[in-house]
A protein has these predicted regions:
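Helix-loop-strand module that forms the ligand-binding subsite of alpha/beta enzymes
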Residues: 34-115
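Glycine-rich phosphate/pyrophosphate-binding loop and the adjoining helix
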Residues: 119-167
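Residue-level signal for well-ordered alpha-helical segments
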Residues: 3, 39-40, 77, 133-136, ...
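N-terminal beta1-alpha1-beta2 submodule of the flavodoxin-like/Rossmannoid cofactor-binding fold
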Residues: 1-67, 161-166
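A sequence-composition feature that detects small, non-aromatic residues
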Residues: 19, 23-25, 30, 60, ...
Length: 167
């Protein structure tokens, strides 16, 4: 019998939505991740967090607490999901691609501090100046400009299936 734990890091609430959806499917409760969270007694730990500057927030901490073969990671971001985005994120965060799931999150400017807003403004400016923008870049630029919720809870179903299928 597997014991599952779902933990999340969320600043604006979008990642929390995914964590609660996944936890509900696994019949457990999603918990806000805090460094030092007890994960030893669980056979599978699902870590949900957001991407900022190419890094999955607090991933290094959870990786120090959970064995790689027990850890599944769901990352939310402003870019639309794609195989290329997943590969890049896995490489940049030193994760096995088969344990990483990337989904669209959201952007609520009212919940961000000055520093995060300034950083996002720089990202937006860089994208605006990019001469060879592709469709994903254009969509990310639109999302960075307008903000909003881009959550699609069903996009986390492959993670749920993989967690349940892994025996």
């Amino acid at each position: 019998m597997h014991k599952y734990k779902v933990v999340y890091v969320s600043k604006t609430g979008f990642t929390k939505q995914y964590a609660e959806y996944i936890a509900s499917a696994l019949n457990v409760k999603a918990e806000l991740y805090k460094k030092g969270t007890n994960t030893k007694e669980y056979s599978k730990v699902i870590f949900c967090s957001f991407v900022f500057g190419g890094n999955i927030s607090e991933l290094a901490d959870i990786k120090n607490e959970v064995d790689d073969d027990k850890l599944f990671v769901l990352a939310t971001g402003i870019y639309p999901p794609s195989p290329q985005r997943l590969s890049l994120l896995a490489k940049d965060n030193r994760l096995d691609e088969s344990r990483l799931y990337y989904v669209s999150g959201g952007l609520d400017f009212s919940k961000l501090n000055f520093i995060k807003k300034a950083m996002l403004k720089m990202v937006r400016s860089t994208l605006e100046k990019k001469s060879d923008r592709g469709a994903d870049d254009n969509e990310a630029l639109r999302r960075l400009t307008q903000g909003g919720c881009f959550v699609d809870l069903n996009s986390s179903n492959p993670l749920i299936k993989d967690v349940l299928d892994e025996r």
